[in-house]
Amino acid sequence: VVIHLAAQAGVRYSLENPHAYVESNLVGFANVLEACRHAHTPHLVYASTSSAYGANTRMPFSEHHGADHPLQFYAATKRGGEALSHSYAALFSLPTTCLRFFTVYGPWGRPDMAALKFADAIAHGRAIEVYGHGRMSRDFTYVADVVEAVTRLLPLAPTGQPVHAHDTLSPAAPWRVVNSAGGAPVALDLFI
């Protein structure tokens, strides 16, 4: 089993250096896919992002919603990774689960993420920069919940065959997308 969590992350930096995202998130991931293909990996778990939903306005986000209009380079490269992994699943029977993580926070989190930026500002008595008057909502996911999602999915490699009559998460290729979220969007002003 291979768990691929490495990536060039972050929306803002992708605007400054899109090549870093292409190299890491597409070229780097293509190298992982090739290695998994040749090693006959029984299950690849790939860290994707809720940003893949892009311009989708249907809430709550569902794996069945379109993800064909990413709005940033970061999201486009992660969505591209999903497409690459689907091709490998279809062509080489590489069982792959793409996990779309939603705003992960917790210990050792990225310093550019809202939770750590807010905590740092509060700890140092600085004002918190809030966009949209704090009314926008995010589905924040604690890092331990991400670990649990990955751990639970490890033994459940997609087969390419529907598990039951209403299963649309297991297409003909042994590949699937699974949302990994807290399950309860929180308004930013309440989160702060």
Predicted regions located by residue number:
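NAD(P)H-binding glycine-rich loop region in Rossmannoid oxidoreductase-like domains
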Residues: 1-24
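Alpha-helical substrate-binding/gating segment
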Residues: 90, 116-128, 138-178
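Glycine-rich "substrate-gating" loop/helix at the edge of Rossmann-like oxidoreductase active sites
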Residues: 71-74, 101-112, 132-144, 182-184
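Non-catalytic, hydrophobic alpha-helical segments
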Residues: 2, 146, 150, 180, ...
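Small-residue (primarily alanine) positions within well-ordered alpha-helices
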Residues: 6-7, 35-36, 47, 81, ...
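Catalytic helix-loop patch of NAD(P)-dependent Rossmann-fold dehydrogenases
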Residues: 16-34, 38, 42-43, 52-98, ...
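SDR active-site strand-loop-helix element
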Residues: 2-8, 44-50, 99-101
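Active-site loop of short-chain dehydrogenase/reductase
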Residues: 40-44, 48, 56, 93-95, ...
